[in-house]
Amino acid sequence: MDEIIACLEQKVLLLTKIWNLTKQIQVRCTQEEVELDQFLDLRGVYIERVNKCNKLIQKLTRDLPADQQKHLTHILQQEPIDEKLCVSDEERQIVKLTLNCADLLQKAGQLDRSAREILTHQCEELKEKINQLRKAEKNPNLYRDTV
């Protein structure tokens, strides 16, 4: 159980970093010059690490006896759990960390959706400006020969 708790603690740290990066991405999306490459790359690295934590947790869970495996799988489902089902402090800690992970994922997801909406809106505005410029010109070709 200690290894699973360590993985969940690591996952909370990584998800916190993802959430913080997503906040920065959202702020950057509102600026005139949107440069997100380094943020997206770093967030991708953290997401890969979270996936590794998930795989290790699954492996460690599979290595448990069948009854413990079923019980722990239920606890890790990220659903509201009756703490009376937890038979040890370790299980209560696992529930707490699992719920913390779910909360961080939800927050990061909301910010990500917001950033995407901002970028989509900006893209639509730019398309509209380009279309207006094209209509204002007699020649719809944006790239005129100046020779």
Regions found by a protein language model. Name each.
Residues 84-147:
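Short terminal interaction segments
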Residues 52-76:
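Short, solvent-exposed, charged loop/turn and helix-capping segments
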Residues 69-92:
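Charged, glycine/proline-rich intrinsically disordered loops and linkers
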Residues 15, 19-22, 26, 47-54, ...:
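A structural signal for well-ordered alpha-helices, especially hydrophobic packing surfaces
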Residues 42, 63, 133:
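Short acidic/histidine-centered micro-motifs embedded in hydrophobic/aromatic stretches
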Residues 1-52:
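Long, hydrophobic N-terminal alpha-helical segment
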